[in-house]
Amino acid sequence: MADWARAQSPGAVEEILDRENKRMADSLASKVTRLKSLALDIDRDAEDQNRYLDGMDSDFTSMTGLLTGSVKRFSTMARSGRDNRKLLCGVAVGLIVAFFILSYLLSRART
């Protein structure tokens, strides 16, 4: 960088400055290329994450619909009369037992 101060002729100084300028321009071009590549990677990653989140949104929407329907049917069954109370208790106990069996099996499968 300080070579231009030691040069004797004006042509030599211009040549040294020109080489240094080209070197710095090449360095800048490579940095710009890396930044552009990084920006494109970030853009692709953001698009992928948006698609993933949109898919999750539709999954949650469909699951909400299923749960809403199940709760409505369960509430209707609970309000329909005393004869169904035994059935309702049986279903509730069955679901609780199934939950514990499933959690036990999953804990055994992990180990």
Swiss-Prot record:
Keywords: Coiled coil, Golgi apparatus, Membrane, Phosphoprotein, Protein transport, Transmembrane, Transmembrane helix, Transport. The keyword Nucleotide-binding does not apply. Its main location: Golgi. InterPro entries: BET1_SNARE, T_SNARE_dom. Residues 108-111 are lumenal. The chain crosses the membrane at residues 87-107. It comes from the Eukaryota. Vesicle SNARE required for targeting and fusion of retrograde transport vesicles with the Golgi complex. Required for the integrity of the Golgi complex. This is BET1-like protein.
